[in-house]
């Protein structure tokens, strides 16, 4: 009888665990929309990539390029002396890497005083 009770407890615990993990959605989709003259929009921790893209585009004015991230970080750097000029953006696993890479790309494209304009990390970034 004790073995039967122990087996039922294990089965009940397993069922509760399965239900608990199935009910909680994994929000790990993000997007950043990058436009001209420092325009941007960002969305992070969305359940679906399409929803994140849509939200980021709605926040960005003008014609914007969209980059996506999943369990990562995105950053946008612009030239402070000419915000409508050089810029750079990056998506990396860690925030420090995305900040550094976006800044490097801004300088690579001719920026003179590149600064971070925006950054975002999703659930695991």
Where are the regions that the model predicts?
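Hydrophobic alpha-helical context, especially transmembrane and signal-peptide helices
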Residues: 5-6, 19, 47, 93
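Serine/threonine-rich, low-complexity intrinsically disordered segments
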Residues: 7, 23-26
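Bacterial N-terminal signal peptides that target proteins for export
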Residues: 1-13
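Secreted/extracellular ectodomain signature
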Residues: 26-125
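Bacterial N-terminal signal peptides
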Residues: 10-22
């Amino acid at each position: 009888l004790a073995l039967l009770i122990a087996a039922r407890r294990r089965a009940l615990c397993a069922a509760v665990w399965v239900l608990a993990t199935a009910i909680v959605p994994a929000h790990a989709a993000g997007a950043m929309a990058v436009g001209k003259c420092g325009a941007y929009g960002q969305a992070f921790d969305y359940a679906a990539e399409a929803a994140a893209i849509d939200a980021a585009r709605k926040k960005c004015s003008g014609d914007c390029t969209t980059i996506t991230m999943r369990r990562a970080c995105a950053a946008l750097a612009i030239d402070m002396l000419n915000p409508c000029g050089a810029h750079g953006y990056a998506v990396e696993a860690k925030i420090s890497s995305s900040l550094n890479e976006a800044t490097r790309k801004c300088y690579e494209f001719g920026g003179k005083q590149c600064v971070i304009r925006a950054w975002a990390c999703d659930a695991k970034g």
